[in-house]
């Protein structure tokens, strides 16, 4: 995709689909070309080579998220082999900076979208539920990347997070219900009060240098 005047209609369509401005789309198109080596699609290998991801404790989950059909709005499960620029924009829209002019409804939609994306990262088997063990494992992986937290402490914090999640979920259940895992509604309750709208970003794609959405 070129971003010349002849592609203005295509750019407007991308603005409508992703919420990015034309300026932001141009910025991301340059980043896409840099990552893909000027190829029309990005594959896993392109993301594997990003230096900022090498030491990230959830590197594989981040890369998987770019090819997850759920995040690409292509189906309830499975992965694609490669993504084009429009699909790249769809994924990047989950990390879109908030605008100061967004109303409460749009902020709520943005928050839900971000949490759904995060839920999909935890829900590795695509069954619309997160087991407590899956949740504990990801929390531990996230903490393991912090040089100030020892492995045993990371495991202890992750265990605590798992127990807290269980208490929130089980507390909502009827007496005869069997606990099967964290649903998305449960996940929303667990993350209630956490400012995911501004904290969820992706540094290696230089999102912080992109102007806020209008």
Swiss-Prot record:
Pfam entry (one): EF-hand_6
Record membrane topology: Lipid-anchor
Record-level Gene Ontology MF annotations: calcium ion binding; magnesium ion binding; phosphatase inhibitor activity; protein homodimerization activity; protein kinase inhibitor activity
InterPro entries: CHP3, EF-hand-dom_pair, EF_Hand_1_Ca_BS, EF_hand_dom
Lineage top rank: taxon: Eukaryota
Binding partners and assembly: Monomer. Homodimer.
Protein name as it appears in the record: Calcineurin B homologous protein 3
